[in-house]
Swiss-Prot record:
Family under the similarity heading: Belongs to the ClpX chaperone family. HslU subfamily.
Phylogenetic classification of the source organism: Bacteria, Pseudomonadati, Pseudomonadota, Alphaproteobacteria, Rhodobacterales
Primary location class: cytoplasm
Subunit and interaction comment: A double ring-shaped homohexamer of HslV is capped on each side by a ring-shaped HslU homohexamer. The assembly of the HslU/HslV complex is dependent on binding of ATP.
Localization: Cytoplasm
GO function terms (MF aspect): ATP binding; ATP hydrolysis activity; peptidase activity; proteasome-activating activity
List of residues binding ATP: 18, 60-65, 248, 313, 385
One BP term from GO: protein unfolding
Record-given protein name: ATP-dependent protease ATPase subunit HslU
Length: 435
């Protein structure tokens, strides 16, 4: 659990997302309130519920990215889902309780990885012993084993192929799903693969190089040192206390008052979400999960529907409203220059792997931002995602010929951008299809 202050959280989000100050402040306060709640006494702690958030804004302005970065900062179980993927209970499709089951699955995987790291040193020693035994043979003398161990540590045996007996993690039930219930495994709540594991599981013999075998052996030896019940208990606590669920496209299940049609399950999805967001208990294969203190962040563009078209009860369960504004040309310039994961840095690094040096000049960056903003304005506003399309088009020729141009320096200025994009950006009909 992160103990960052709201100011520190916003500062960290600023490294990856430009603008949207109100949304950043809202999620920062929501995260800090979790830390505050943990400082309270037992009598009051259960009474403090998270203030769920509704983000309203066009596509590509940072709604999803804010939530994803927040989850990483909080080191919390996180799940992003689309509201349109779910149907009302009784109809063919996934019901909303699957959200919590998927969140629990993600939490167990994260918790297991974290606990593996804690026992990695001991697991590494056991893995090394198994590799030495495979190299020297089971009945080898201690002196021979030590000789192989020394060579192993010096990396002299990395390419040598050995045969090992490993746990078979593939589940014969993995691909069996209930017809019409995507993502719902055959066997319902029964974890058949876990049942097989309890009886020792299946082991297979595999031939691997010494270097390849280490990661598999360390993971297997670490799992032997872990208590499965402790992993599940820690994961379920993380879900219940720190879980974050991001529900995208919530506006697509908001039925407009004047709308007519056969989409009967839209309002039903909203009704099914009510108890989940309010607080209920969901059965998972790891045990029951209470959703009372899971933070729900819903988002939507609300181009056609309005937030007031949501069920009044659902509106009441999303008390914090945040509007995200559309991005401007100046925002695009900042996105290309100020963020830690800026596209300019990414393309420079990608071309450097081919020995090509790429230099972005300020007027080139401004030209990219201008064209992205113009196309957004004239065709369809898809926010920062337009930059991906524009830059990919500019670099199309260079990306193809880069292996033949090793040692060259390419300067991306306004003329370079104009040469590769000028005609397309000026022709609305063409940009509608190409950009």
């Amino acid at each position: 659990m992160s103990d960052l202050t709201p100011r520190e959280i916003v500062s960290e989000l600023d490294r990856f997302i430009i603008g949207q100050r109100d949304a950043k402040r809202a999620v920062a306060v929501a995260l800090r309130n979790r830390w505050r709640r943990r400082q309270l006494g037992d009598d009051l702690r259960d009474e403090v519920y998270p203030k769920n958030i509704l983000m309203i804004g066009p596509t590509g302005v940072g709604k999803t990215e804010i939530s994803r970065r927040l989850a990483r900062l909080a080191r919390a179980p996180f799940l992003k889902v689309e509201a349109t993927k779910f149907t009302e209970v009784g109809y063919v499709g996934r019901d909303v309780e699957q959200i919590i089951r998927d969140l629990a699955d993600a939490a167990v995987i994260e918790t297991r990885e974290r606990m593996r790291d804690e026992v990695k040193a001991r697991a590494h020693k056991s893995a090394e012993d198994r590799v030495v035994a495979a190299l020297a043979g089971e009945g080898a003398r201690e002196q021979t084993r030590e000789m192989f161990r020394d060579k192993l540590k010096r990396g002299e045996l990395d390419d040598k192929v050995i045969e090992l007996e490993l746990q078979d993690n593939s589940s014969p039930f993995g691909m069996m799903e209930i017809p019409g219930q995507p993502g719902q495994p055959m066997g319902g709540m029964m974890d058949l693969s876990g049942l097989m594991k309890a009886f020792g599981g299946r082991r297979v013999r595999r031939k691997l190089s010494v270097a390849e075998s280490y990661d598999l052996l360390i993971a297997e030896e670490a799992d032997k040192l872990l208590d499965d019940e402790a992993v599940k208990a820690a994961a379920l606590e993380a879900v219940q206390e720190n879980g974050i669920v991001f529900i995208d496209e919530i506006d697509k299940v908001a039925a407009r008052t004047d709308a007519r049609g056969g989409d009967v399950s839209r309002e039903g999805v909203q009704r099914d979400l009510l108890p989940l967001i309010e607080g209920t208990t969901v059965s998972t294969k790891y045990g029951p999960v209470r959703t009372d203190h899971i933070l729900f962040i819903a988002s939507g563009a609300f181009h056609i529907a309005k937030p007031s078209d949501l069920l009044p009860e659902l509106q009441g369960r999303l008390p914090i409203r945040v509007e995200l504004r559309a991005l401007t040309e100046e925002d695009f310039i900042r996105i290309l220059t100020e963020t830690d994961n800026a596209l300019t840095r990414q393309y420079t690094a990608l071309m450097a792997t081919e020995g090509v040096t790429v230099q972005f000049i300020q007027d080139g960056i401004r030209a990219l931002a201008r064209i992205a903003a113009e196309v957004n304005g004239s065709v369809e506003n898809i926010g920062a995602r337009r930059l991906y399309t524009v830059i990919e088009r500019v670099f199309e020729e260079l990306s193809f010929s880069a292996p033949d141009r090793s040692g060259e320096t390419v300067v991306v200025d306004a003329a370079f951008v104009e040469k590769h994009l000028g005609d397309l950006s000026r022709s609305t009909d063409l940009s509608r299809y190409v950009l």
